[in-house]
Regions:
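Aromatic "clamp/platform" in nucleotide-sugar-dependent glycosyltransferases that forms part
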Residues: 328
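Acidic anion/phosphate-binding donor-loop and adjacent secondary structure
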Residues: 139-141, 164-165, 178-195, 250
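A charged, aromatic-enriched C-terminal amphipathic alpha-helix characteristic of glycosyltransferases
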Residues: 384, 401-432
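Conserved donor-binding/catalytic core segment of Leloir-type glycosyltransferases
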Residues: 11-12, 198-214, 220-223, 237-239
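Nucleotide-activated donor-binding/catalytic signature segment of Leloir-type glycosyltransferases, i.e.
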Residues: 249-311, 315
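Catalytic machinery of carbohydrate-active enzymes
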Residues: 443-572
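Carbohydrate-associated surface elements
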Residues: 158, 177
Length: 572
């Protein structure tokens, strides 16, 4: 696609920039910076926001989540299609068609871009996938996508090294953008600690989304061991997370009881949904009354929909004496960098992205771990050793003030150098402005062209002509999904026939699992002619009946059907 305008139009797809997630924070930071560049026009494709909803941002923005109830109903019972909807698969085509970008920049986990390489627009724009790869062995889909996009970027050097070891030499690391200007040691730190009644405590902190890959049981066990070995130390564990998320995360109160830990020694962050005030105190359930504004049942522990602002989060970091981040694997783990910038020594599992943050030259100390395999994927995962957590906590507690200051200063400088918005955006601009379209080798193009020369008859030869029905719908994802939901009804109308669904290859996955579709056939323009499909004169055609729901009668004669179509309308 040639550029006909002075600015480079960049469509950026990721979590909505106002979401309180790692991807959301990164999205906000890079969009604010790219928007200021006179050579770049940014457009946001916001995952998590319904398509068609007004989004108040300084730049052009579109929600990617389906708003069509028919599509939502069609994907509801299929987990893979439901996940695709959450990642914007069914609306990204319409957004690309509207804004006609020069560059597509996708920032999500790699599975968010499943089948994107088969989309019609993929070869027309420069494509950059900036993804999080957090475990070994590298996911097969990442290895398949890398040669098909113009540039693959990863969030952690761990992933870059693994990809290059497998022959993918152009992969580069660009860390997620941390606006460290919000995070720094505060002069009124002691006043804040006194306000929240932790002024005499050794506070261990962990900021995280409550999900199973965050090693909460390991941390609680390490905390318990530290307390048992150091009974004279008044210790608190501050878990800044969504305690109420028990269905997909950890039931933290249950683990406290199981491990015999005093509920008063483990703190939670509460946020008022009316006045936005926050409180750090022992967990006592959700939907509490607000002591600041008097609101009823409006105070909950922080969650991805409602958290604290950056200023308040920095205050929470300043309540801590040390930051501890045990996890099974991760793409970057932004709270680690925030904690460093806020003046904390960070204890981090040295696996996956942890290798970018765990060592002394990075302002941290590594946590030992043992390997286990994730049953469903066979990925190598880390289970952090509670004994190592205990030992590192003791090391920090007993560390001299000069050694602490040196390590903290190292961490602050490291974040500014490696993870700053300026550094990240500078690298992104380089790739946006300089990446070239991959050129296929002539011999490869020829082989692929030959492979695509498949005769339609090859799909039809096992079914007699009089038993064939064609449904032709080349695009888009939403229309294909809706049509797919009608195939059972079509089969009931024509029980003696086999249904052949004709669509573009990028939509095969939406159809393949439908038991009422006999075969899926790749679309070509020849399928636009009803006479070619159903026959005329001496030409018998390819199907007994063919339906072209995307064609208007004013455009194409599409309602002949050899006089064999049926209807379900009854006149009384």
């Amino acid at each position: 696609m040639t550029m006909s305008h002075s600015k480079i139009k960049v469509l950026v797809q990721s979590n909505y920039c106002r979401m309180v997630t790692g991807f959301g924070k990164n999205m906000k930071n890079i969009l604010l910076a790219l928007h200021k560049d006179p050579d770049i026009e940014v457009i946001e494709a916001a995952n998590g926001v319904p398509y068609g909803r007004d989004i108040c941002t300084p730049w052009e923005s579109y929600g990617t989540y389906p708003s069509d109830q028919k599509i939502l109903k069609a994907v509801e019972k299929n987990p893979s299609k439901k996940r695709a909807a959450q990642y914007g698969f069914y609306n990204i085509d319409s957004i690309v068609e509207k804004c006609k970008p020069d560059v597509f920049l996708g920032i999500e986990d790699i599975w968010a871009f499943k089948e994107y390489e088969n989309k019609a627009w993929w070869s027309e724009v420069k494509t950059i996938i900036w993804t999080t790869l957090d475990s070994l062995p590298i996911l097969d889909h990442a290895l398949e996508v890398e040669p098909k996009c113009d540039q693959m970027l990863v969030w952690a050097s761990f992933a870059e090294e693994a990809m290059k070891d497998l022959g993918h030499k152009t992969v580069a690391t660009v860390h997620g953008a941390v606006d460290y200007s919000h995070f720094q040691p505060l002069d009124n730190r002691n006043e804040l600690r006194n306000l929240h009644a932790v002024d005499s405590d050794f506070v261990i902190g962990y900021v995280f989304k409550n999900q199973l890959r965050k090693s909460v049981p390991n941390l609680l066990e390490g905390f318990k061991k530290f307390k048992e070995k150091n009974p004279e130390v008044s210790t608190k564990l501050l878990l800044h997370t969504d305690w109420g998320e028990k269905s997909m995360g950890w039931d933290i109160p249950r683990y406290l009881k199981e491990k015999g830990l005093d509920n008063g020694e483990v703190l939670a962050t509460y946020v008022c949904h009316k006045c936005d005030d926050y409180f750090v105190q022992p967990y006592s359930g959700e939907d509490k009354d607000c002591s600041s504004c008097g609101g009823k049942k409006c105070v909950k522990t922080k969650n991805s929909g409602k958290g604290v602002g950056e200023k308040e989060l920095n205050e929470i970091y300043n309540l801590m004496n040390v930051y501890c981040h045990p996890f099974t694997s991760g793409g970057q783990e932004l709270p680690i960098q925030e904690a460093k910038a806020a003046g904390l020594i960070t204890l981090v599992t040295d696996y996956s992205c942890g290798t970018d943050s765990a060592y002394e030259h990075q302002g941290g100390l590594p946590l030992a771990w043992n390997e286990y395999r994730e049953p469903s994927t066979q990925f190598i995962k880390a289970t952090t050793c509670p004994d190592s957590i205990c030992e590192r906590l003791e090391e920090v507690y007993n560390m001299s003030e000069s050694s602490k200051s040196k390590l903290i200063k190292t961490g602050i400088e490291y974040v500014k150098e490696k993870f700053s918005v300026q550094n990240t955006v500078s690298q992104l601009k380089h790739f946006i402005k300089n990446v070239e379209k991959r050129n296929e080798k002539p011999e490869e193009t020829k082989k692929e062209s030959e492979a695509k020369k498949i005769k339609i008859e090859d799909f039809l030869k096992d079914v007699p002509l009089e038993e064939r029905i064609a449904v032709v719908l080349p695009r888009s994802a939403g229309d294909v999904l809706i049509a797919n939901s009608l195939m059972e009804n079509l089969q009931s109308l024509y029980p003696d026939k086999k249904i052949f669904f004709v669509t573009q290859p990028e939509f095969y996955d939406l159809i393949n699992d439908n038991p009422f579709v006999h075969k899926v056939i790749p679309y070509s323009e020849s399928f636009e002619s009803l006479y070619t499909l159903e026959g005329i004169g001496g030409h018998k055609g390819l199907f007994d009946i063919a339906f072209l729901p995307h064609c208007m009668t004013q455009k194409t004669y599409s309602y002949h059907h050899n006089g064999k179509d049926k209807n379900q309308f009854k006149l009384r």
